[in-house]
Design a protein with these regions (language model features):
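Ribonuclease/tRNase effector modules and their secretory precursors
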Residues: 1-96
Length: 96
């Protein structure tokens, strides 16, 4: 996934770090194999749901685009049941 960096400020950074995910782990997620689950529109803003393996843990992230930069809005570690469900879905899609 190509992008021009991250959009961090006093609004989104504390919220993302508040779930125990480090800045390095969040950024590693997007520099590795990230899976885009879906987009939705909240108000006038398109939000994208993504997950992947970043810095040794499965991570779930809601983000939006600011130009070519990623603006994480909420980030957390995934629960085992979520990981299993999404990995199974990826396997099914890759078999097609």
């Amino acid at each position: 996934m190509q992008f021009g960096g991250f959009d961090w400020d006093s609004g989104n950074l504390p919220k993302c770090l508040g779930h125990g995910v480090s800045l390095a782990q969040i950024e590693a997620l997007f520099r590795g194999d990230v899976y885009i689950v879906r987009d939705s529109v909240v108000g006038r803003e398109r939000r994208t749901l993504a997950f992947g393996f970043g810095a040794g843990r499965w991570i779930f992230c809601v983000f939006t685009w600011r130009g070519d930069r990623i603006r994480p809005l909420s980030v957390r570690f995934m629960h085992d049941k979520e990981v299993k469900r999404y990995v199974e879905e990826i396997s099914r899609l890759e078999e097609r």
